[in-house]
Amino acid sequence: MALSHSVKERTISENSLIILLQGLQGQITTVDLRDESVARGRIDNVDAFMNIRLANVTYTDRWGHQVELDDLFVTGRNVRYVHIPDGVDITATIEQQLQIIHRVRNFGGKGQGRREFPSKRP
């Protein structure tokens, strides 16, 4: 997962199921869009607002016409459904992504280095 650069995006990801989609990076999947079209390709990136960048895409419009695209950017507002590939362990993927976020948040571990959210001093 290419980590979000802002604290806000990491917080949104951590507190929603978007973290599951971020864990699908590199997987080939199908994204159903609100206009009844379908895009199938490899997930390159998913941000905290569910914007999805796909590569090697087969785009099928609502009338069944197919177009091959090198890449496609889908805004989160236009996503209806993302198909989770059968081989993905959902629980393990979420836990792995949470560990990545927590590792970045703590900047090197407990008691080492600067913290993203400094602890309150009594």
Swiss-Prot record:
It holds the Pfam family LSM. Keywords: mRNA processing, mRNA splicing, Nucleus, Ribonucleoprotein, RNA-binding. GO terms for cellular component: Cajal body; U7 snRNP. It comes from the Eukaryota. It is found in: Nucleus. Its main location: nucleus. One of its GO terms (molecular function) is U7 snRNA binding. Not methylated. Methylation is not necessary for interaction with SMN. GO terms for biological process: mRNA processing; positive regulation of G1/S transition of mitotic cell cycle; RNA splicing. Residues 16-88 form the Sm domain. Belongs to the snRNP Sm proteins family. Appears to function in the U7 snRNP complex that is involved in histone 3'-end processing. Increases U7 snRNA levels but not histone 3'-end pre-mRNA processing activity, when overexpressed. Required for cell cycle progression from G1 to S phases. Binds specifically to U7 snRNA. Binds to the downstream cleavage product (DCP) of histone pre-mRNA. Component of the heptameric ring U7 snRNP complex, or U7 Sm protein core complex, at least composed of LSM10, LSM11, SNRPB, SNRPD3, SNRPE, SNRPF, SNRPG and U7 snRNA. Formation of the U7 snRNP is an ATP-dependent process mediated by a specialized SMN complex containing at least the Sm protein core complex and additionally, the U7-specific LSM10 and LSM11 proteins. Interacts with CLNS1A and SMN. This is U7 snRNA-associated Sm-like protein LSm10. It comes from Mus musculus (Mouse). The gene is Lsm10.
